[in-house]
Amino acid sequence: MFGPFKLTSPVAGGLLWKIPWRMSTHQKTRQRERLRNVDQVIKQLTLGLHVQRCQDKGLTYQEAMESKKKYKPRSKSLRLLNKPSVFPKENQMSSKDKYWTFDKKAVGYRKGIHKVPKWTKISIRKAPKFF
């Protein structure tokens, strides 16, 4: 109770999490930058696969870059990443989707994305359908 061995909240209830309830402006800036970086990687992958398919057909790199028709990736997962309805770009997302995520246990069914474990390593872009 008193003295050198008094009870503290981490000792009493286990690990004390100290996550603020809102994201700082610096966290939001870095989150937007991460979203833009992912968009850039997807764009480069799509462009590289387009150039590869053009070169398979006998076109040069310059002709492939200047062609008006862009070939879509053959893999279904990459085609889905290019669809805005499935994986929107950073500038197409609302601020609610950038910084908040769906949580069925939360009061308003939303929680800050910074409370998701490993939130800097995953890309959460869409809320569930009809939400």
Swiss-Prot record:
Keywords: Mitochondrion, Ribonucleoprotein, Ribosomal protein, Transit peptide. GO terms for biological process: mitochondrial translation. It is found in: Mitochondrion. GO terms for molecular function: structural constituent of ribosome. It comes from the Eukaryota. Residues 1-12 form a transit peptide. Its main location: mitochondrion. GO terms for cellular component: mitochondrial inner membrane; mitochondrial large ribosomal subunit; mitochondrion. The keyword Ribosomal protein applies. InterPro entries: Ribosomal_mL60. Present with 2100 molecules/cell in log phase SD medium. Component of the mitochondrial large ribosomal subunit (mt-LSU). Mature yeast 74S mitochondrial ribosomes consist of a small (37S) and a large (54S) subunit. The 37S small subunit contains a 15S ribosomal RNA (15S mt-rRNA) and 34 different proteins. The 54S large subunit contains a 21S rRNA (21S mt-rRNA) and 46 different proteins. Belongs to the mitochondrion-specific ribosomal protein mL60 family. Component of the mitochondrial ribosome (mitoribosome), a dedicated translation machinery responsible for the synthesis of mitochondrial genome-encoded proteins, including at least some of the essential transmembrane subunits of the mitochondrial respiratory chain. The mitoribosomes are attached to the mitochondrial inner membrane and translation products are cotranslationally integrated into the membrane. This is Large ribosomal subunit protein mL60. The lineage of its organism: Eukaryota, Fungi, Dikarya, Ascomycota, Saccharomycotina.
